[in-house]
C-alpha cells in the first residue's frame, strides 16, 4: 500500500509541475497599432499648432515607435519616451505621478530611475486592466495628454 501512495504522490508532483511550466501568454502592441497610435497623437498635436515628438512603448518598456515632428524641440523625443515609460511603469498617467510627487515627498526617490519623468503627457495603453504599453507626447504644453489620448482613440476598437 505504501508503494501505491508513494507512486501516487510522485505522479501528483510531476503533473502539477508540468502544469506550472507552461509559457505565459501576454497581449502586446503590434507595430501597426503603435504606428496608428503615434500618428494619431501627432496629427492631433499638429492640428492644434504644436511641434511635438511621440513615443509608443510595449508592455516591457521597449520602444516600438518614436516620431519627431517637423520643428520639434531637441529634447522632445527623450521627453516623450520618458513620459511613456513613466505611464507604463506606474500603470497610470504620468500626470498622476507628478501629483503623487507633489503630495508625497517620499515619492521623490522614484526620480532616481533614469527614464521616469513626472510631467503630463504619458498615458498607459490598456486592454481591460492589463497595461500592454504606453504612449508619451512632448512639446504641447498643457495638451500632451489630449494628444496621447487621441492616439489611443485611433485603436480603441482593437483594445477590447
Locations of regions flagged by a protein language model:
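Flexible, solvent-exposed loop/hinge segments and secondary-structure transition points
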Residues: 21-160
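N-terminal signal peptide c-region/cleavage motif recognized by signal peptidases
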Residues: 16-19
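Internal alpha-helical transmembrane segments of multi-pass membrane proteins, especially GPCRs
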Residues: 7-8, 121
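Bacterial N-terminal signal peptides that target proteins for export
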Residues: 1-7
Amino acid at each position: 500500500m505504501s508503494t501505491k501512495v508513494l507512486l501516487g504522490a510522485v505522479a501528483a508532483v510531476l503533473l502539477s509541475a508540468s502544469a506550472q511550466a507552461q509559457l505565459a501568454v501576454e497581449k502586446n502592441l503590434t507595430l501597426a497599432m503603435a504606428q496608428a497610435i503615434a500618428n494619431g497623437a501627432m496629427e492631433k498635436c499638429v492640428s492644434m499648432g504644436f511641434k511635438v515628438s511621440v513615443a509608443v512603448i510595449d508592455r516591457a518598456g521597449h520602444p516600438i515607435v518614436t516620431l519627431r515632428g517637423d520643428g520639434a524641440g531637441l529634447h522632445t523625443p527623450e521627453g516623450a519616451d520618458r513620459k511613456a515609460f513613466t505611464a507604463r511603469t506606474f500603470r497610470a498617467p504620468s500626470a498622476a505621478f507628478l501629483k503623487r510627487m507633489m503630495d508625497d515627498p517620499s515619492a521623490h526617490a522614484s526620480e532616481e530611475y533614469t527614464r521616469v519623468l513626472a510631467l503630463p503627457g504619458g498615458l498607459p495603453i490598456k486592454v481591460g486592466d492589463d497595461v500592454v504599453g504606453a504612449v508619451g507626447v512632448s512639446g504641447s504644453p498643457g495638451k500632451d495628454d489630449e494628444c496621447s489620448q487621441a492616439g489611443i482613440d485611433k485603436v480603441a476598437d482593437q483594445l477590447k
